[in-house]
From Swiss-Prot:
GO terms for biological process: maturation of SSU-rRNA. This is Ribosome-binding factor A. SUPFAM superfamilies: Ribosome-binding factor A, RbfA. Monomer. Binds 30S ribosomal subunits, but not 50S ribosomal subunits or 70S ribosomes. It comes from the Bacteria.
Amino acid sequence: MANSRRVEKLAALLKREVSELLVNGIRDERIHQAMITITSVEVSGDLQHAKIFISLFGEEKKKDEVLVGLEEAKGFIRAELAQRLQMRRSPELVFKIDKGMTKGPAVLDLLNALELERKSKDL
């Protein structure tokens, strides 16, 4: 099992390199139909698996196409990562939509409503 510093370093490198690949390395048009942002990367302790959390901005039906494109590009992305990071074995990648990004505005609205309610009770 790798130490936590190595896991964190690999997560940061994966985030940077996958972001670069999404912008410049992948030619699949499905991936470019929505704006993709990598919000975080979680790497397992044995460095064999990586969850890449993404947020997608665009039409709902195009988001599904983007995910299909990412799934099909996984092999290419892993090969590029192995070459760029000079790794004998690159981690298995799993792309997940970051639900926190979509729920954030709703939570802020609830907090603002509670604040207004509290202020009205104080008056």
